[in-house]
């Protein structure tokens, strides 16, 4: 996902090419990110023999079993000693699986203590001590399996058990002498690096710490900030977008479409009294107003002879009649326009130019509103954007609010510098790469991401394991 951490110090580690297990940090109380692995291409290769094979070095990462830190193991060890002293008779009577489980825990604590002692030794250790360190980790890994008689024997005798090692990269001094990485190790993880080959590998990166933003008073104190990110397309939001993006041409076009509609509705409500006022200014009585209404009805159903009679009446009235005819036609058009706003478009010539503008607007929008599921991610489009859709490889600028299922906000970007990333390149959690694809500039949608497309079983600070994440996102720019 978006980065939930910030760098605080430089991380650097030298891993010699002797196959030794090098702890990633002196203790497991620091969180760090490895961003580069490199070798010195001018360094002379160190071959084990006089072989003429190609010089290269392979970096591997080894992780101790999770959930076995030193304090917990020591506490378990002390608790087991107390329980043995207090209930020695019970153990003699109630033998069975419980005894094996206690023995396994004691053995795990002993192996972990052996591992910590080996880690605290000087770097200039001999090969035998190196082998003991590897054997201690091997026993610790094996201790996580269910305890059996065979396991007890193997744990004591099979010190050469191979650990599960993951290859990170292979470097050579000719072409690939450095490799960008993005490996984050959480606080409390016990991680080791190992290099085999002809060159020492140098790891660099940063010590990092989670970004801790206060969220307890979010609902009470951040109401105004919440208005900066509202899914309803109101004028405040359009203004915010203009300030952030520096582009207001499209928003002005929309405002030009909507304001005349509002004006016509208001004038429609006020035009009825004006008809009477205009007649009053020209000193027409109530009888004349009634006669005018009858004339309007006669116009819709009269034959050719009645039209000629009406023309004669207008000629007899002189200029006053001509002046009055124009306001009547104008008022009729305005009433007709207001009616169209409520009941839909009309084929009249006066309305046709206005009908093209909403059509053009519909052609610019991208996608469809509604809920759909894409590769396990539930997407609910609240507002469609305009222009081309975001595709893999595009750099996108986003606003977002991230929540858990219980409504707790764990992260957000509602103002200031937008969050940017390259879509489809693994710079964010997989659910974001899926959920943001297809959005257009100005689009808003809600993305519901299952845990296996977010942070999985482990989670991160502020997000428990197996958490489903809900994001309200808005696309500001596609680069």
Swiss-Prot record:
Compartments where located: Nucleus
Protein function: PPIase that acts as a histone chaperone. Histone proline isomerase that increases the rate of cis-trans isomerization at prolines on the histone H3 N-terminal tail. Proline isomerization influences H3 methylation thereby regulating gene expression.
Protein family per UniProt: Belongs to the FKBP-type PPIase family. FKBP3/4 subfamily.
Keywords: Chaperone, Isomerase, Nucleus, Rotamase
PPIase FKBP-type domain mapped to chain residues: 393-479
Enzyme nomenclature, EC number: 5.2.1.8
Main subcellular location: nucleus
Chemical reaction(s) catalysed: [protein]-peptidylproline (omega=180) = [protein]-peptidylproline (omega=0)
Assembly information from the UniProt record: Binds to histones H3 and H4.
Composition bias, Basic and acidic residues: 272-299, 325-334, 348-364
Residue spans of biased composition, Acidic residues class: 40-49, 68-93, 148-162, 214-256
Pfam families: FKBP_C (PF00254), NPL (PF17800)
GO molecular function terms noted in the UniProt entry: peptidyl-prolyl cis-trans isomerase activity
Protein name as catalogued: FK506-binding protein 4
């Amino acid at each position: 996902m978006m980065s939930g951490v910030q760098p605080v110090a430089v991380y650097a580690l030298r891993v010699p090419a002797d196959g030794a297990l090098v702890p990633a940090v002196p203790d497991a109380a620091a969180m760090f990110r490895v961003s580069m692995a490199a070798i010195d291409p001018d360094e002379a290769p160190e071959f084990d023999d006089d072989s003429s094979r190609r010089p290269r070095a392979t970096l591997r990462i080894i992780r101790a079993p999770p959930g076995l830190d030193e304090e917990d193991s020591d506490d378990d060890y002390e608790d087991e000693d107390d329980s043995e002293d207090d209930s020695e008779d019970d153990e003699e009577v109630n033998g069975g699986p419980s005894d094996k489980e206690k023995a396994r825990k004691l053995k795990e604590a002993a192996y972990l203590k052996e591992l910590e002692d080996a880690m605290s030794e000087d770097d200039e250790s001999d090969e035998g001590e190196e082998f003991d360190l590897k054997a201690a980790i091997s026993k610790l890994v094996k201790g996580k399996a269910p305890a059996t008689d065979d396991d007890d024997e193997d744990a004591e005798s099979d010190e050469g058990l191979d650990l599960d090692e993951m290859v990170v990269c292979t470097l050579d001094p000719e072409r690939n002498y450095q490799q960008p990485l993005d490996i984050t190790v959480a606080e409390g993880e016990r991680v080791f690096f190992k290099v085999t080959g002809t060159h020492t590998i140098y790891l660099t990166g940063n010590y990092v710490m989670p970004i801790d933003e206060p969220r307890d008073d979010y609902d009470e104190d951040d109401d105004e900030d919440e208005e900066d990110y509202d899914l309803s397309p109101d004028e405040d939001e359009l203004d915010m977008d203009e300030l952030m993006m520096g582009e207001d041409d499209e928003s002005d076009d929309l405002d030009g479409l909507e304001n005349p509609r509002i004006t016509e509705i208001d004038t429609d409500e006020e035009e009825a009294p004006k008809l009477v006022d205009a007649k009053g200014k020209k000193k027409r009585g109530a009888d004349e107003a009634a006669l005018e209404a009858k004339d309007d009805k006669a116009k819709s159903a009269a034959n050719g002879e009645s039209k000629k009679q009406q023309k004669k009446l207008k000629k007899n009235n002189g200029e006053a009649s001509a002046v009055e005819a124009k306001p009547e036609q104008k008022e009729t058009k305005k009433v007709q326009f207001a009616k169209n706003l409520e009941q839909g478009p009309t084929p009249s010539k006066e309305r046709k130019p206005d009908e093209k503008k909403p059509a053009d607007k519909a052609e610019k929008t991208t996608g469809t509103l509604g809920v759909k599921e894409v590769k396990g991610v539930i997407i609910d489009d609240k507002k469609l954007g305009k222009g081309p859709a975001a595709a893999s490889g595009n750099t996108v600028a986003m606003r977002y609010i991230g929540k858990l299922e219980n409504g707790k906000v764990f992260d957000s970007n509602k103002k200031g510098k937008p969050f940017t990333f390259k879509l489809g390149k693994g710079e964010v959690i997989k659910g974001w790469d899926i959920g943001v694809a297809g959005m257009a500039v100005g689009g808003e949608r809600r993305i519901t991401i299952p845990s296996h497309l977010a942070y999985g079983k482990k989670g991160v600070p502020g997000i428990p394991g197996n958490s489903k994440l809900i994001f309200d996102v808005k696309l500001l720019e596609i680069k």
